[in-house]
Amino acid sequence: MKRGTATKQITEGVIWKQILAFFFPILLGTFFQQMYNTVDTIIVGRFVSTQALAAVGTTGPLVNIFNGFFTGLGSGATVILAQFYGAGNKQGVRDTLHTGVTLSLLLGLLIMVLGIGLGPVALKWMHTPADCLDMASLYVRVYFAGALASMLYNMEAGILRAMGDSQRPVISLIVACLVNIVMDLVLVVGLKMGVAGAALATVISQVVSAVMLLVVLLREKENPLELSGLGIQPKLLRRILAIGVPAGLQLVMFDLSNTLIQSGINSFGSTVMASWTAYTKTDALTWMVSGAFGVAITTFVGQNYGAHRYDRVRQSVRVCLAMSIGTVGVISLLMTVFRRVILGVYTTDTSVIETGAYIISVIVPFAATFMPVEIFAGTMRGMGDSMRPTAIICLSVCVVRVLWIMTAVKKYHTLLMLCVCYPMTWVLCAIVFIVTYLRTFRPRLEAV
């Protein structure tokens, strides 16, 4: 298969420059994707009520559980397509493209049905306070009504990135984000629709981004999407699931542990809930950077592993580790120093700001310790091994967090005891990943 410019940019050239050239569009896209919920949070917090802000915040872990598993499933298609593309296997790219898009449509419908039907029940299980429950239930019902568009967009963006195109997904997100802001102002501020308006604005913007990338794939010259070619290839589906199911389970385990933590946060009342919501939005940049490096290394390793450029795989790990740790370290320092100023963007309630500032001071300084987890997990998946990173994360992070919440937090019931479970599990998981990579994956790359 004739390789396009985008592929050459990933499999050839100075590694740190090529990774950054791929990383920045992903980061920008992640930023605008995060802006969906951030704009909702700011407008709901300032123009509706503190209870509405808490209601939107408490739905986060639940939304992530539903979306996480099925998005993880879809990531299997992205990894396989990147390997086919790097190897120059045109038929493999075509088959993965059509199987992946079909899978995203089916999964999107499933998420929509499950989310609308089970979302409110799950919120009750999370001990959502009575003064927030109705608004939170309304938000998740409207949000999950747009699950099909969200799932389709994520698959489309992953496919384009796997082929080295990280720019057009960003363009679609910029347009969608602008649509989201306008619709938030119209529906929440203008029409006074409250949390339902915020959720509906997000759904509309997701539809816009999904349609834009659908048009891009249909018009792609080298590897176009053909509606007549949509369908599931069983053999390819098994390969996708072999990578995607463990990735999805990992995200679910992460989000289940976060849901348990959210349940603990809920037990402290609406003020702490609002503070936690504001903190998570404040800390979003850290995880946007982390996630962008994770996507970049997965795609980079996938293409270079498929092209048998194992030397570049090894070097990319070192480069991404250095850049991610350095970047997140600087962000964490700035966030800790200016935490009250940043929190003031989301709310004017002084008690919420002070509690949020305390949460940041406990968690954020340790964020860089999670970067080895992101980089090594992405590397392993790019090489086609999704089970091992899933097992490491589930045991080192999720299980430990659950045990911590059920023992230490239950016994002492302080905000400090709840917050420390994050840095504690980050450090533990990073150590396990470093040892696993050095003992198992590094020798494999050197052997071939």
Please state what every model-predicted region is:
Residues 12, 16-35, 39, 62-69, ...:
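Residue-level signal for short hydrophobic patches within transmembrane helices
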Residues 31, 35-53, 123-130, 186-193, ...:
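Helix-terminus/linker motif at the lipid-water interface of multi-pass membrane proteins
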Residues 21-40, 142, 153, 176, ...:
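Transmembrane helical elements of multi-pass membrane transporters/channels
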Residues 44-64, 130-135, 195-196, 236-243, ...:
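Interfacial/gating helices of multi-pass transporter permease domains
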Residues 1-23, 81-146, 190-245, 301-366, ...:
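Short alpha-helical transmembrane segments in multi-pass integral membrane proteins
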Residues 53-113, 150-169, 275-333, 337-339, ...:
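Small-residue-rich hydrophobic transmembrane alpha-helices
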Residues 65-68, 180-184, 210-214, 285-288, ...:
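Hydrophobic transmembrane alpha-helices of multi-pass small-molecule transporters
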Residues 74, 142-161, 169-177, 198-211, ...:
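Short runs within selected transmembrane alpha-helices of multi-pass transporters and secretion channels
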